[in-house]
Amino acid sequence: MTAHLKKAELHCHIEGATPPELAVRQARKYGVDTGTIIRDGAYVWEDFTSFVKCYDAVASLFRTEGDYALLAEAYLTELAEAGTIYSEIIVSPDHGNTVGLGADAYLEGLAAGMEAAKARKGIESRMLITGIRHLGPEAVVRTAEYAASHRHPLVTGFNLAGEERMHSVAEFSRAFDIVRDAGLGLTIHAGELSGAFSVRDALDHVRPARISHGVRAIEDTDLVRRLADEGVVLEVCPGSNIALKVFPDFPSHPLRRLYDAGVRVTLNSDDPPFFHTSLAQEYEIAAHAMGFSDGEIDRMTRTALEAAFVDEPTRERLLAALHI
């Protein structure tokens, strides 16, 4: 059991953390039929494309600051009750704009929920604004410009998510230059749906501190060595990888091989209810399906805190809290 271990998470898309029962309540609030996206209490999707459609449908059920405050507080409370001391949530102002709420109000709603969870449960959290890859490079530049100019104290990083097989990484280098110059931490989805080349491209064109997923780097021994040598942190999401058929099962998942090769890896849940998982379950998977010891799992949590996009005093407090 890993319930006694402190936890930290760097990779969870906040709309993707919506429990189906909360989605149903939101749908009733707005008179929306969920029959095509929820069946028998579970989200309905078959592949990455249909997963994105289901995700977007769920995101459309959150339309006010209060809705987003509720979502953020609920998720962070769940994490805190499982022993989590730090969380980074991936947020998309594009969703706020799509529902007519606006990006500013979207972030303020989430921030209110984050602050409420901290007040009630003590959990520290930050937001990473994400560009949506399949919306194209210019849309991502606009998101980057917004992230760079809207300096909310809880927004500390920038990500690129979405359909990894659309557009080259190089096409997004301008967007990452904008947020790098603004002092935001950088991470990018790579090495999930696309192979090792996408991780290499991300390192060459974006120069991120972290890679979201990155697990298909295992296909290239030289790349694995480069990740280890450069200290790039991978935000690994085993349950997501199995659900999306990146790997067929946990025994074939490369987390153990990456760890043993000296790559800095962390445990994350990605879009937990969509993939029938949770951060607590990811820790259990690491222990029981992958054979990691408590000490090794603790090391991954420490890596997450060392790589967190926070100021140094906050990092020191979190590291000190790891073994209290």
Curated annotation (Swiss-Prot):
Cofactor(s) it depends on: Zn(2+)
Q: Does the keyword field hold Zinc-finger?
A: no
Q: Site feature Important for catalytic activity: at which residues?
A: H213
What's in the keyword line of the UniProt record? Answer: Hydrolase, Metal-binding, Nucleotide metabolism, Zinc
Which protein is depicted? Answer: Adenine deaminase
Positions with a binding annotation for Zn(2+): H11, H13, H189, D270
* UniProt record similarity statement: Belongs to the metallo-dependent hydrolases superfamily. Adenosine and AMP deaminases family. Adenine deaminase type 2 subfamily.
